[in-house]
Amino acid sequence: MDKKASRIRRATRARRKIAELGATRLVVHRTPRHVYAQVIASNGSEVIAAASTVEKAIREQVKNTGNVDAAKAVGKAIAERALEKGVETVAFDRSGFQYHGRVAALAESAREAGLKF
């Protein structure tokens, strides 16, 4: 099994467990160049809030879009947008990525901005 297939297997398993809880989830995806985050409703069919380093507002705040500082900016933005929509508690879905580096930075930044998970 290659690296991507292993990550997808881990992500599927985690999503199944989150679906059993019926919780709103904060989904993180990372590429070498960008970081993306979405808050998805418990039914799985509605995106409540989204933020990424592709957005002009976030891109202007950071020098490089693929590093820890960019992930912190995305974490803060997603937390603010989720709180505006009335979502305070989420389940963190790391999409099979290791809780380290950019993924951890995004999570810590979202927690500091007021999101609970």
UniProtKB/Swiss-Prot annotation:
Q: Which GO terms describe its cellular component?
A: cytosolic large ribosomal subunit
Per the record, the domain of life is Bacteria
Please give the InterPro entries that the UniProt record associates with this protein.
Answer: Ribosomal_uL18_bac-type (IPR004389), Ribosomal_uL18_bac/euk (IPR005484)
Cytoplasm as UniProt keyword: no
Q: Which GO terms describe its molecular function?
A: 5S rRNA binding; structural constituent of ribosome
Please provide the record's keywords in A-Z order. Ribonucleoprotein, Ribosomal protein, RNA-binding, rRNA-binding
* GO terms under biological process: translation
Record flagged with keyword Ribosomal protein: yes
Instruction: Say what the protein does.
Output: This is one of the proteins that bind and probably mediate the attachment of the 5S RNA into the large ribosomal subunit, where it forms part of the central protuberance.
Its assembly, as annotated, is:
Part of the 50S ribosomal subunit; part of the 5S rRNA/L5/L18/L25 subcomplex. Contacts the 5S and 23S rRNAs.
Write out the similarity annotation: Belongs to the universal ribosomal protein uL18 family.
How is this protein named in the record?
Large ribosomal subunit protein uL18
Q: Which gene encodes it?
A: rplR
